[in-house]
Amino acid sequence: MSTNLRKTHPLAKIINNSFIDLPSPSNISAWWNFGSLLGTCLILQTITGIFLAMHYSPDISLAFSSVAHITRDVQYGWLIRNMHANGASLFFMCIYLHIGRGIYYGSYLYKETWNTGTTLLLLTMATAFVGYVLPWGQMSFWGATVITNLLSAIPYIGNTLVQWIWGGFSVDNATLTRFFTFHFLLPFTIMGLSMMHLLFLHETGSNNPTGLNSNTDKIPFHPYFSYKDLLGLILMLALLLTLTLFSPNLLGDPDNFTPANPLSTPPHIKPEWYFLFAYAILRSIPNKLGGVLALLLSILVLFLMPALHTSKQRTTQFRPLTQILFWSLIANLLVLTWIGGQPVENPFIIIGQMASILYFSILLILMPIAGVIENKMLS
């Protein structure tokens, strides 16, 4: 009797061990669907992105009109562009839910997987930022100007660094060209790192809702979880297509329908919705350098999660105190997202400052303390 090819062929064996015969915990819930959804998002974004790049011109005199040309004259160009723009929103929605699941169920204790994942988040944010500049609308231009300008807060080398990134003394043609280059390059870096992320995950196996060792109760990934993931995939694609076909500009900024004009500043400069929480933290500190550091720390705090875990239990499933803090953190992030989109005036300033303090307090102080208290209550 000959052995199954998928178990012997060098290439097929890798795929088999990663997606077919992979031993998976029998009790993982729908919260474990997001990894495959993110992979799908990445593939979808790459395909639509490549088709857009075929018709796009990274030049300040042509960029805006080339995007208009794509939506008007290219076969299904409107669909490709809207799927790419809204696909990014869906990508971040899945990322945030994936990270939230990781925090709730203590998945961050797989340090290598968690650290590669956090690095993936940073790379995805960088990709989304440079991509937002490409249509060369008002918000693209001013977003690029404001965010790159933050680097000038770095002592001594700040101004030189900003000019080096701009490729001149202002956001200009050189900036657009290099941003297009990075936007094309980074997704492939993300793909490579995603494979590393999976490699590290398969070294330990998946976590599960109980946080206990599940080696005694594993089932093959296919057909059980491949079909379960397929349901999540259909729901995600339904959401993406609904957004793309019925309300494609819902999450965009109206200012981006105006070509970039260095002589006119939009009344409210704000990023896409998925960056608003970090933008609110940045704005809540009156000092420029302090704001930049807080902005960085708001994401980099994820790297500290394994070190801040004080509880004897892995998941939050059986820890009521930490659960309250976790959901307070989620509510707080929603408040920050709302504040990020509001003008800099009272009462929004003080709400933003309070929410920023609470964000760091929950993650760095209250959650570790709650873990210690819960340990005491158990003993």
Curated annotation (Swiss-Prot):
Location relative to the cell: Mitochondrion inner membrane
Protein's GO biological process: mitochondrial electron transport, ubiquinol to cytochrome c
Alphabetized Gene3D superfamilies for the sequence: Cytochrome Bc1 Complex, Chain C (1.20.810.10)
Keyword line: Electron transport, Heme, Iron, Membrane, Metal-binding, Mitochondrion, Mitochondrion inner membrane, Respiratory chain, Transmembrane, Transmembrane helix, Transport, Ubiquinone
Residues annotated as binding heme b b566: H98, H197
Cofactors that this protein relies on: heme b
One cellular component term from this protein's GO annotations in UniProt: respiratory chain complex III
One Pfam family hit: Cytochrome_B
Residues that bind heme b b562: H84, H183
Membrane protein topology class: Multi-pass membrane protein
Domain of life, per lineage: Eukaryota
InterPro entries reported for this sequence: Cyt_b/b6_C, Cyt_b/b6_C_sf, Cyt_b/b6_N, Cytb/b6-like_sf, Cytochrome_b, Cytochrome_b_C_euk/bac, Cytochrome_b_N_euk/bac, Di-haem_cyt_TM
Bound cofactor: record note: Binds 2 heme b groups non-covalently.
Family membership noted in the UniProt record: Belongs to the cytochrome b family.
Function: Component of the ubiquinol-cytochrome c reductase complex (complex III or cytochrome b-c1 complex) that is part of the mitochondrial respiratory chain. The b-c1 complex mediates electron transfer from ubiquinol to cytochrome c. Contributes to the generation of a proton gradient across the mitochondrial membrane that is then used for ATP synthesis.
Further remarks about this protein from its record: Heme 1 (or BL or b562) is low-potential and absorbs at about 562 nm, and heme 2 (or BH or b566) is high-potential and absorbs at about 566 nm.
Quaternary context: The cytochrome bc1 complex contains 3 respiratory subunits (MT-CYB, CYC1 and UQCRFS1), 2 core proteins (UQCRC1 and UQCRC2) and probably 6 low-molecular weight proteins.
Protein name: Cytochrome b
Organism: Terrapene ornata
